[in-house]
Amino acid sequence: MLRWLTAGESHGPALIGIVEGVPAGVELTSGQIRDALARRRLGYGRGARMKFEQDEVTIMGGVRHGLTQGGPVAIQVGNTEWPKWEQIMSADPVDPEVLADQARNAPLTRPRPGHADFTGMQKYGFDEARPVLERASARETATRVALGTVAAQFLKQLGIELVSHTVSIASVTVPEGRPLPLPKDVIALDADPLRCFDRETSNAMVAEVDAAHKEGETLGGVVEVLAYGLPPGLGSYVHWDRRLDSRLAAALMGIQAIKGVEVGDGFLTAARRGSAAHDEILKDENGKIVRQTNRAGGIEGGMSIGEVLRVRAAMKPIATVPRALRTIDVSTGEPAKAHHQRSDVCAVPAAGVVAEAMVALVLAEAVAEKFGGDSVPETQRNLQSYLESIPATLDSVGR
């Protein structure tokens, strides 16, 4: 069983992630994690923080000489801006007079619409939003990307690879029927300003971001994650919480600012007749059982079917809007403009990288449940044995 947990605040000394249940023998280095975190900072329309924010990665346990050891893997992502926040975010009590001299410590009493600020203050009894936004911040996703790197490395050694890309920015959308990116296309994808696989659409997306920036607006969009090389049978139909699509949806909805998830053709399927909504099961000239379409996105009945997994996540426009939204100053009870420090115009490309990490964690957990071994070679043998045992052709069904 794969379990993971993160801790830390946006402006704290570091973020911490721990993942347990990783078999021995997964190839992992701090450089691979740094590369993944660098991808999280990609994207046209990002704010100033991406320019000065550096991710200092330290593997604290569970890895020796580039290989996992079978124990929990602990990763620390250090905050290079910590010296500026050391007094304000100190875990130990600080002299109030010292804090009073620091402008950064001004109480955040104007909660931002669309954020966790106000409800978090109500729930936990805070008189300002700082304690809420420090943990609710999307900065926490750096740890998820780090842990997702561990999961992705494990999956890769089993022949499973993931790709994420941007499908839409605001109303600018990749036309239906365009080719899907493959694992070999990741470098080219990451070089694109919006991580979009269609150049013409990418150019239109850049123009959309520029227009929003001039107008003091923010933009959302849709990202898609593809998983290649999955065997059939991950997940289960026997309970709702074991369904692979259920677990993927929960993981993606747990990403900050994600407001919708679909698997395969998703909501488009609801507008179709039944005869055009499903993937018929056929046989090819060799008698191999195949599906000519993949409208289901690689999942039927809560289980992977051996086709390409395809899931999408819709990200709302960033809630910290430069042209500040209306709110109430909780210290006075009077109408006010919401607090605004700095923000991105568009963070959809980064959301794709985070979504990719979350899908990797879910799939790694499902693989460990089905084929789990104490080491990578044992897991590989279990997977190979399973693949050899399931019918691939009509001649072998029932044997």
UniProtKB/Swiss-Prot annotation:
It catalyses: 5-O-(1-carboxyvinyl)-3-phosphoshikimate = chorismate + phosphate. Keywords: Amino-acid biosynthesis, Aromatic amino acid biosynthesis, FAD, Flavoprotein, FMN, Lyase, NADP. FMN binds at R135, A136, S137, Q256, A257, G301, K316, P317, I318, A319, T320, R342. Pathway: Metabolic intermediate biosynthesis; chorismate biosynthesis; chorismate from D-erythrose 4-phosphate and phosphoenolpyruvate: step 7/7. NCBIfam families: aroC, PRK05382.1. CDD domains: Chorismate_synthase. Its EC number is 4.2.3.5. Its cofactor is FMNH2. The keyword Transferase does not apply. GO terms for cellular component: cytosol. This is Chorismate synthase. Belongs to the chorismate synthase family. It comes from the Bacteria. GO terms for molecular function: chorismate synthase activity; FMN binding. It comes from Paenarthrobacter aurescens (strain TC1). GO terms for biological process: amino acid biosynthetic process; aromatic amino acid family biosynthetic process; chorismate biosynthetic process. This reaction introduces a second double bond into the aromatic ring system. Homotetramer. NADP(+) binds at R40, R46.
